[in-house]
Regions:
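Short amphipathic alpha-helix that is part of the acyltransferase structural core
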Residues: 1-34, 129, 138-167
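Conserved donor-binding loop and adjoining core beta-sheet/short helix segment
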Residues: 29-90, 194-206, 212
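Flexible, substrate/cofactor-facing loop regions flanked by secondary structure
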Residues: 31-35, 142-206
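Acyl-donor-binding surface of acyltransferase catalytic domains
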Residues: 67-70, 76-142, 265-267
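Conserved acetyl-CoA-binding loop-helix of GNAT-fold acetyltransferases
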Residues: 83-96, 210, 216-230, 248-253
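Conserved hydrophobic beta-strand within the GNAT/NAT acetyltransferase core sheet
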Residues: 103-107, 205, 236-240
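Conserved active-site alpha-helix within GNAT-family acetyltransferase domains
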Residues: 109-127, 221, 243-261
Length: 274
């Protein structure tokens, strides 16, 4: 049975019981800031649905869902359960209320239950992401050729931006209250970019891209260095493909370190239409 959660007190003890669980802890609830933003505030937001799954009056699952009808898009902000039936009920709830929507799930790579159920629904999975956190930043790195996004470069930026994601160049540019973007410029041409949040205590690069023909010229390092420099005095974390050894070494050389037990897996699913 599913009930709408109307107050944090209804689910706080249940959520706390998942901290540190190697299989079922939620990488979206690793800090107090994440608990506030992804769970507590979601209960109050009109575009979020926080639901509890119950069996014999006992909570067996807790899910926070961001739902954007205009975009036909859903993002699971919180997903906590150790029971297959709870995940099944949550997915059926999506099928009942938002058929045809695109849904993104970010969860613990050890959560074999959710992965199996999404596999059965033919979801697409991205590579496992390794979390890294900035310790002592390496300052003084040359950032020549790196500029903040401006109107004059907007068209070029949007043209090369990754379009196979919710946060397209156009959406990032409109979300000035959340993101700042840095561009790599070569002879007046945009050859790379980095989108990074700036409003949190621990900010995160969302997307880093350099055109193929301009790679191995140091632009990725310069973009990250500029983002770190402008982020002071806040912290920074990032996610990188867990098997991308060259990128991990680059980030380690700039002061980032791996965080054990906080990797994540992202799945994309087109909600089934009944």
């Amino acid at each position: 049975m599913i009930k709408i959660i109307k107050a944090y007190e209804e689910c706080s003890a249940f959520a706390a019981g998942f901290q540190g669980d190697p299989h079922f802890s939620d990488p979206m609830l690793c800090s107090e800031e994440q608990i506030q933003g992804n769970l507590i505030k979601s209960i109050e937001k009109p575009d979020c649905h926080v639901i509890g799954v119950y069996f014999d009056s006992q909570m067996t699952g807790l899910f926070a869902l961001l739902v954007l009808p205009d975009e036909k898009y859903i993002e699971m902000l919180v997903g906590l359960s150790r029971e297959k039936e709870a995940y099944r009920e949550m997915l059926q709830y999506l099928e009942q209320h938002w058929p045809g929507y695109s849904a993104d799930f970010v969860f613990n790579p050890g959560n074999y239950i959710l992965k199996e159920l999404l596999d059965l629904r033919r979801a697409e999975f991205e590579p496992e992401q390794q979390k890294m956190v900035l310790g002592t930043p390496i300052l003084g790195i040359d950032t020549t050729g790196i500029e903040p996004l401006s109107e004059g470069y907007m068209a070029q930026y949007c043209d090369i931006h990754n379009k196979d994601m919710y946060w397209t160049g156009e959406r990032v540019a409109q979300a000035k209250d959340r993101f700042r973007t840095f561009l790599a410029i070569h002879d007046g041409k945009v050859v790379g970019y980095m989108d990074v949040t700036y409003i949190f205590k621990e900010n995160e690069p969302f997307d880093l891209f350099v055109l193929k023909e301009y790679r191995r010229r140091g632009y990725g390092r310069k973009l990250l260095a500029k983002a770190v420099e402008q982020n002071e005095p806040n912290g920074m974390m990032l996610l990188v493909d867990a098997d991308n050894t060259p990128a991990i070494r680059l980030y380690e050389s700039m002061g980032f370190a791996k965080v054990q037990g906080q990797n994540n897996l992202t799945a994309h699913w087109k909600v089934s239409e009944q």
